[in-house]
Amino acid sequence: MMDIRFSLHPTLLRAFQRALAIVLVLGLLLSISPPRPTQAESDPAPPPDAARVIELITSLSGEEPFQTTRIYDRRGILLADIDDRGRRTIVGYNEIPDIVIQATIATEDRRFFQHQGIDYLAIVRALWQNTQSETIVSGGSTITQQLARILFLSPSERYEQSIQRKLKEVELAQFLETYYTKEEILAMYLNMVYYGNQAYGIAAAAEVYFNKSLSELTLAEAALLAGLPQAPAMYDPFRYPERALERQRTVISLMQEAGFLTSSEADALRAQPVLFHPYQRPRNRAPHFVNYIRDILIERFGTEGIHRGYQVHTSLDLRYQALAERIARAQVKRKGKKYRFSNAAVVIIQPQSGGILAMVGSIDFNDKKIAGQVNMTTVPRQPGSAIKPIVYAAAFERGWSPASIIWDLPVYYTLDGRRRYAPRNITGRFYGPLRLRMALANSLNVPAVKLLQAIGIPAVLETAEKLGIKAWRQPQDQYGLSLAVGGYEVPLLELTHAFATIANQGVYTPLYPITEIRDGAGRVVFQAKPRETQRQAISPLAAYQLTSILSDARARRMMFPRPSPLDTSQITAVKTGTTDGWRDNLTVGFTSYLAVGVWIGNTNNKPMRNAVGVYTAGPIWHDVMEAIWADESLYDALGYADGVLPQGFILPPDTVTIPVCDWLPGKFTPRCPRMVEEVYPASLPTSLPTGRDRGYCLPAGAAPSPPEAYFLPLPKDTRSAAAARNWVRKRFLRAVQHLNDCDTTPNKRPLVKQPKLLPPRQWVLSAEKMKTSVHLQASNQYGE
């Protein structure tokens, strides 16, 4: 009941008294008319659960009540609340403790379970009290009337002091009492009433003021909350704690008068201290990822739909997030000034599930100097040479292999009938005939462009889309040969996703940053089912061939001598990227169970100073990998809770290994002192992917062998063929008119050996610091 005194002008006071008198008369008339059966009398219903409460409020008010949407990491740690409109969590009647119901009834409507929506005794009492005091001491509104006001009246109507409004309220209250049970009315009221500080409903109030669930409330706390709806601003516990406690003491007295408390219980309750523990919002946990999830929710449910109390469980693991953030920040601090970069981004993907375990969009979300709120994992940037595996994947799908030969010789292309495009290697040198293994492992530009020219731009665009790259949606004629060397932008997230597909034996799994969504009533509305949505993007053989090149430390040693950040203590496949003008550095790599992508640069696209991916982004990638391997407690997120991670990559079935002549870039010799084993389909190819039959013979390593194992074809175009012949004259190779003229008798040559894996080390942070600081950050920053 209202017990707040407001001074009114005599005219307004008389008007209000007349209104109450009319209501009293109306109530008397209604009381002598035959009563309609209530819902409880005609068809007893069980107390409403949360779903029923939502259904009732929605049907009566015309819109679903907003609720707080919560976003969690994969282990159930709260990342963020979406509560722009206020905080509310709908609960069922049986979830509301008796002490809350008793305190509310004693305070607001002592005869709630006796009257039919209008408490005429309360109205008479209010009329008498107001007349005697010449102020409004009590309004006499029941809980049902208050609910009617909340559900059916506009904000302006709710505070209108008119006869018409009061009559309307009475009629609506009678309607509610006729068709709904007392439990349904009380449940709707306790979920809709405002408690101040953006807390709507009793569950939100318990959280906002005491950081508790309803079941954890004490009687003293319940009494305090019950007193707030009368005047939330006046009794605000944070601004006016003494007023709030005085109001609580009044509620305790009302509970005693209503028979809910004995005199001794009331006295003990008044003496019991009440400690406020304001709700602590999550501290900026994975903010770029949270915004990424919010965008997904808006796309799925609409701008208003995200305020429906969803419980959003995501794939992100705050331990991985803390680890990636720590290393990225340390690298920017360590090398940023030297190379003139100010920002870094990291994304970690689990290939089999499509889950995003970490998303570091910048090193500091709140740093305006680096535009920290921009998520650099989703912003398209030029990938540099990190895109080359996509080109090679398209080639391997079309009959090429790591042993296929391409000529690294000067070449130029005429574009648009005018411009000339002449690709160059970063060393400024040309290396003659190369197997694709050596060309990709050493990230040479000329072979990549020639390969793109050979297989066609449409083939690469098609393969890229299958692998997970969605950025390249322009008409095909908008793309040129610079596609092979990273001339077209792609987000780090999509590129890492493509690498994750390769890691998963060519099986594409859509990204599933959200694993499950439950609505405000706890019902599942979305469940990630990665295995049901997977598809074979490229063949397992093509994926393995790519992986074998990207994990070949020996093959890449010309451009990446050991030790480098690409050398890890376990077998990994990795590719770096450096763009023209030193604007973007990337390193993307994977194991069979983990893909990690790293970007280094400046958000404003300002050039760095002679920065290359292997020494800027590479150390972050390396240290993230090593830190994960060093901590078995992290393996559960990868699907290996038993603490044993698989080693290496799986050789596809129906394949054979064939030794082929091996040489390093620029060190060709016709004697072929060593051979390297390459993987082929069991049904060996009988022709070259270029279709070229003229060329030079090489020693064969096995019989049978595919032609590319023992044959060096001449380039097709006249200019390149002339350059190739000039190159060959100095090497004393035997020329033949057709590859069938070559002697395919096997020559025994020793096989090359891969260098041993290096012991674990950290390039950015020492192992000791990583072991302590990352876990401290995860526990302190994220409240684990």
Predicted segment positions?
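Short pre-catalytic segments that frame enzyme active sites
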Residues: 54, 70, 78-89, 204, ...
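Soluble, non-transmembrane domains of envelope/secretory-pathway proteins that act on or interact
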Residues: 27, 33-48, 58-59, 72, ...
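Active-site beta-strand/loop architecture of penicillin-binding DD-peptidases
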Residues: 294-297, 342-385, 390-394, 465, ...
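Conserved catalytic neighborhood of penicillin-recognizing serine enzymes
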Residues: 129-157, 215, 279-285, 400-460, ...
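Extracytoplasmic
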Residues: 64-69, 73-77, 86-88, 96-102, ...
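Non-catalytic, structured segments within soluble enzyme domains
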Residues: 33-39, 135-326, 451, 462-477, ...
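N-terminal type II signal-anchor transmembrane helix
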Residues: 2-72, 89, 111, 131
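Active-site-proximal helix/loop microenvironment
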Residues: 273-279, 470-524, 531, 535-537, ...
